Regions:
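Short, charge-rich amphipathic alpha-helical segments embedded
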Residues: 80-107
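N-terminal leader/linker segments that initiate helical-solenoid repeat arrays
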Residues: 8, 12-77, 88
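Short helix-capping/linker turns of helical repeat alpha-solenoids
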Residues: 48-51, 55, 87-92, 104, ...
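Hydrophobic face of amphipathic alpha-helices that form TPR/SEL1-like repeat modules
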Residues: 61-65, 96-103, 129-139, 166-175, ...
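Canonical positions in the second alpha-helix
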Residues: 44, 84-85, 117-120, 156-157, ...
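Structural signature of tandem alpha-helical TPR/SEL1-like repeats
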Residues: 70-80, 105-116, 142-153, 175-186, ...
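Hydrophobic/aromatic side-chain positions at a characteristic register within alpha-helices
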Residues: 63, 70, 85-86, 105, ...
């Protein structure tokens, strides 16, 4: 009941007072379940001024090229560029700077995290609420650990379109005794925004319910998002495994060419997992049945751009 109450109340307006420790009354379980309704919203990020966007793109290029080397001096330059871009209205730079700091690549003080998160919130960027939820959950960025308030911020972020928050809240609501229908809606919403793990998780539930066509549609979203296991499962699913093979049976007829293409894509995604690959052209290469497969030269849009390595 406590968990559901927190996730419900997080959907209400939050005043941005990150130190709020007010006690909220708990509603009866039946009322909470009735009010957990979720409407899918995709996160929007305001356009950036041209100069700030140029800095962001260059910083992102440096970051991509430093993923394997992890040169600290390069991290310092990336941080500097992200800071300038962020302070000049580039919210993607704000997000990348905070994410990088939480992973130990950049140095961002607690009060800076809160100020930058508030900038996102003020701009209508749902990730701002998600970040505050992380800080409250972990007791970091100068905030006291507060599980209830963390959950409220996660739910607010999910309602406003944060795919990461939608995935996180869905995991909490997923069990049968809580709110699995809401969890499914959140996972689908996150998958539509390119959250590969949400797509993979949702496909498992659809497969178990023998909703195979829905499952492959969601797995296709997973492939587009760069989630390698989605490509692997589709590859094996089109080899027509026995229905008893619960891991890979997807109710599809054998199609060796489809299986081979998905396997090639899986290898690219697995080999370049460190670089966060995606397959935005998946529906051009592998439209789902009953569509016929078009000719394919074996190239992937993301891989070609990655190998070209143009800033």
């Amino acid at each position: 009941v406590l968990l559901l109450s927190c996730l419900l109340l997080a959907a209400c307006d939050l005043d941005g007072d990150f130190n709020n420790t007010k006690d909220y009354p708990l509603n009866p379980l039946t009322e909470i379940k009735a009010n957990l309704a979720f409407s899918c919203v995709h996160e929007t990020i305001p356009a950036s001024p041209t100069d700030a966007n140029t800095l962001f793109q260059y910083a992102r290029w440096l970051q991509k090229n430093n993923q394997l080397k992890q040169d600290k001096s390069v991290d310092t330059e990336i941080e500097r560029l992200y800071r300038i871009a962020s302070e000049n209205g580039n919210y993607k730079a704000n997000i990348n700077l905070q994410n990088g700091a939480m992973r130990g690549h950049f140095n961002v003080r607690g009060e800076e995290h809160l100020r930058m998160s508030q900038q996102l919130i003020d701009a209508g960027v749902a990730t701002g609420y998600y970040f505050v939820g992380v800080f409250l959950k972990n007791g970091s960025a100068g905030l006291k650990q507060d599980t209830e308030m963390a959950l409220r911020h996660y739910r607010k972020a999910a309602d406003q379109g944060s795919a990461e928050a939608q995935y996180y809240v869905a995991d909490k609501l997923g069990p049968k005794k809580i709110a699995p229908a809401v969890a499914r809606q959140m996972r689908k919403c996150a998958a539509e925004q390119g959250h590969g793990r949400a797509a993979a998780m949702l496909s498992i539930y659809l497969r178990d319910e023998e909703k195979y066509n829905e499952a492959i549609e969601v797995l296709q979203m997973g492939v587009a998002a760069g989630e390698s296991t989605s490509a692997s499962r589709l590859s094996k699913g089109f080899l027509n495994p026995a229905p008893s093979n619960q891991s890979y049976y997807l109710g599809q007829q054998e199609d060796l060419e489809r299986a081979a293409r998905y396997e090639k894509i899986w290898r690219v995604l697995a080999n370049y997992s460190y670089a966060n690959p995606t397959v935005p052209d998946i529906n051009e290469i592998l439209p789902l049945p009953p569509a016929q497969l078009p000719p394919w030269d074996g190239k992937l849009q993301w891989l070609e751009a990655h190998l070209a390595n143009v800033p």
